[in-house]
Design a protein with these regions (language model features):
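N-terminal leader/capping segments at the start of a protein or of a new domain
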Residues: 1-61
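Glyoxalase I/VOC metalloenzyme domain signal
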Residues: 3, 14-15, 22-26, 50-54, ...
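Double-stranded beta-helix
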Residues: 8, 12-13, 17-22, 27-31, ...
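Conserved short histidine dyad/triad with adjacent acidic residue
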Residues: 26, 76-126, 160-162
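A short beta-strand-loop-beta hairpin characteristic of the jelly-roll/cupin
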Residues: 117-126, 131-152
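Ligand-binding loop in jelly-roll beta-barrel domains
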Residues: 69-74, 138, 147-151, 160-184
């Protein structure tokens, strides 16, 4: 990553006072050779609602997936490098491998060469409600029939739609995501 991420986790001591139990870089980081330069930093994960506020010092020691557990959440920061040098070379197998490594090959929409009218080889759809905050740089939010240029300070509420993130600039883009398990059968409005 271009800048280090510091994660501070609080908890309680034996007397119930608030304390810092962890202060340092994230311990769950994933990169994929099929998507060069993309770095996923998992910061925290929950697997129940309401979320447990006690428990393990590091909730990210389990395998990293794209989607949160049922009734869970994922909090992460993803850095997207400029993609102009490699995006046109992404094969269907590359896209499947990149998403398969996150346990989410089922989420891929188009499989690499964007068949079926998909606009980006990494178009995907999950049954999650995602809050995205662009921290630095800029990135296009690619949807089925439109695109939105997102810049630092912009927020997206992504509601289980087919989408991709495309950095067409010459600088990295860093986005914070909170993914919440959702119910995509509740209707589309």
């Amino acid at each position: 990553m271009s800048e280090k991420i510091r994660r501070v986790v609080t908890g309680h001591d034996a007397q119930g006072r608030s304390i810092v139990i962890s202060d340092g870089p994230p311990t769950s980081i994933k990169q994929s050779p099929q998507r060069p330069g993309v770095v996923i930093n998992n910061l925290w994960m929950t697997d129940t609602m309401p979320a447990q506020t006690s428990g393990p010092e590091d909730a990210t020691v389990k395998p990293m997936g794209l989607e949160p557990a049922a009734s869970g959440t994922n909090f992460r920061i993803v850095e997207f490098p400029p993609e102009t040098d490699y995006i046109g070379k992404v094969s269907a197998a590359d896209a499947q491998k990149a998403f398969g490594d996150l346990g989410a090959s089922h989420a891929l929409q188009g499989g690499g060469q964007a068949p079926g009218g998909k606009r980006h080889p990494f178009m995907h759809k999950t049954k999650t409600l995602d809050y995205a905050l662009v921290l630095s740089g800029e990135c296009y939010l690619v949807l089925d029939d439109s695109e939105v240029l997102m810049k630092a300070g912009d927020v997206c509420v992504q509601r289980a739609t087919s989408h991709a993130w495309s950095n067409r600039s010459d600088k990295p883009c860093k986005i914070a995501f909170i993914l919440i398990d959702g119910d995509a059968t509740a209707g589309h409005h």
